[in-house]
Amino acid sequence: MSSEEPPARTSWWPRLLGRLGVAEDAEQGDDDGSVRAGAAGPPGDPDGAPRRPPREGRGAEPFPPSLAPGSEHLDAALRTLELTVRRRLDGLLQGNHLGLVPGPGSEAGDARVYQPGDDVRRMDWSVTARTSEPHIRETIADRELETWLVVDLSPSLDFGTGGCEKRDLAVAACAAVVHLTRGGGNRVGAIVATGQDLVRLPARGGTVHAHALMRRIAGTPRAPEGTRGDLLGALEALRNPPRRRGLAVVVSDFLGDVDWDRALRGLAMRHDVLAIEVGDRRDEELPDVGTVVLADPESGHSREVTTTPTLRRRFAAEAAAHQEQVATALRAAGAGHLRLRTDRDWIADVVRFVVARKRGWSGQGSAPVLTSTPAGRS
């Protein structure tokens, strides 16, 4: 293995391979915990660098800008992200679709046809009498919503083989939530977890605070490789001390042990919960590249494997089983579930989710779990 080859950035492959009985090769690691690619690099360009398409032109628009912490271009990238979010969300989500949380509230809203399962206490008898069809009266959510972001920025998010890193996608998702929930006296705060640090950013209102909040989230230093994520600790930090009822948005790749399910159920007893799962194609399937050395940034462990068809099938099955375990835990908590991918138009996925969610609240369909189909697949 040549010492000139670049370090291989990978996601959680070694942990999944361990479940499949593939032996660990700890000697492949360098002194700094990184590993170097073997005969074939990790998914991305042939030299081992993750593939990132050009930022110029319309083809770059579906992907968020690079939001590397500490970069002198971070403020400019955040302004670009904000303009993109405002232009595309405001253009596609209008009226009652511009928001993430429905009633109940104290202000009367529109009447609609009764659907099985609706609360009969909200029956509008005057409209029912005029139309000879049962109607209920919806309510408008009270103002001054308090939204909390729980943002997982552990080392497994410092990875991406599509148009961006998962970390960039997580920050972009936060920007969309802030845009959809601010205004009208609403407040937004955040708990940012890297596995090494846990940062609490108080909930406040106003544009100045929203900009400062996004700068703090995007500027969170990367945790060193070998640092385990701590989503459970972040959820517990939001639960205790108890905060006023509102919206809790959990942004993570949800890789690793599902040890956070009880904490999430406890959180959902007090708040509306939305889980935003950011993923990459290579979290779900191994590339057909022959022999490759893979490194887990959250453990520092590495494995050299040959990506045979059998191993790739077993890996994909194990990854799918993990995704289903995560989805089951989120359903058990009653959380909304939005999946975003580094190779997808993330804002289009957000729009579809919000529209479907509103339809579910209005009785036109069930509350959605939006899954993203990779580009080029059916």
Where is each model-derived feature located?
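N-terminal juxtadomain amphipathic helix
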Residues: 120-122
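Exposed, interaction-prone extracellular/peripheral surfaces
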Residues: 2-100, 113-118, 127, 132, ...
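A positional/architectural concept
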Residues: 104-105
